[in-house]
């Protein structure tokens, strides 16, 4: 089905004029800066952070574009991936009228952002195998459905979604399809970023929080068409990515081997932890994982969670979520952390 971004944008967004910051109007790096009402004497800390950062994060985009083989014009940075999720909903969904479609069990912020923006939520559960029911998804789409969110690898289940099924949805849906790839570095696939040119209605989300180990800095990436990126840039806060985060991201992108080594260690620990968990009486079922966590079904997820907390081992109780009855989600830790988890579970 043909996609037209203009047809799904809210009228006020089409006509909106972005805030023009001082760094937008003068892009040079040298000079006497008397334009942004900054403190000319420096900072109250040793690190000099008295000047506003690049509002478009050009250096970081250039570095990431080389790594991903994607033009910088197709990259948007957000304050975590939650920011582009919220911006996409605000750009396309009229409060009290439009809807998004989610596929539970899935990442909770899609629903939270929709609720905050007074946007209806259509839920189409995954199959019992945590797979996409494409026919049910497309049948549930309404005239005013603007976005479908697909998390792959999925949180909290850990599995990759079928590429062919995602493509069917992309081809059939006239709105935006968001493919959330926060955990893609732990999966044996390149994901959907290489397919950007084929699907103008696709937005691919990735993050520096997981494989890159930079969760505290809050940096998420949206890969999309130049037109969608332009809309996101128009409505984002002017300096949404701070200087320290930009500098840290540049350093990380210059040391990709460090990230790769951490991913290797996590995958090795994931495989070992799965094998050891499967031997325990508390474990009724382990689900396949393409992420840095494992979903384990037990007889009583809340009791298992509480027991672990008593021993200062913190997991996530997912037992109240649809299709995840009895489940706890376990992040893959270091070897020592994983051994401690197993020791506690052996005494449950």
UniProtKB/Swiss-Prot annotation:
Residues with PTM N6-(pyridoxal phosphate)lysine: 210
Pathway: Amino-acid biosynthesis; L-histidine biosynthesis; L-histidine from 5-phospho-alpha-D-ribose 1-diphosphate: step 7/9
A Pfam family reported for this protein in Swiss-Prot or TrEMBL: Aminotran_1_2
Entry keyword Transmembrane helix: no
UniProt xrefs under InterPro entries: Aminotrans_II_pyridoxalP_BS, Aminotransferase_I/II_large, HisP_aminotrans, PyrdxlP-dep_Trfase, PyrdxlP-dep_Trfase_major, PyrdxlP-dep_Trfase_small
Cofactor section: pyridoxal 5'-phosphate
Alphabetized GO MF terms: histidinol-phosphate transaminase activity; pyridoxal phosphate binding
EC category: transferase
Keywords recorded for this protein, A-Z: Amino-acid biosynthesis, Aminotransferase, Histidine biosynthesis, Pyridoxal phosphate, Transferase
Keyword Amino-acid biosynthesis set for record: yes
E.C. number(s) listed in UniProt: 2.6.1.9
Catalytic activity: L-histidinol phosphate + 2-oxoglutarate = 3-(imidazol-4-yl)-2-oxopropyl phosphate + L-glutamate
Database matches in Gene3D superfamilies: Aspartate Aminotransferase, domain 1, Type I PLP-dependent aspartate aminotransferase-like (Major domain)
Gene Ontology biological-process entries: L-histidine biosynthetic process
Stated family: Belongs to the class-II pyridoxal-phosphate-dependent aminotransferase family. Histidinol-phosphate aminotransferase subfamily.
NCBIfam families xrefs: hisC
Subunit description: Homodimer.
Protein name: Histidinol-phosphate aminotransferase
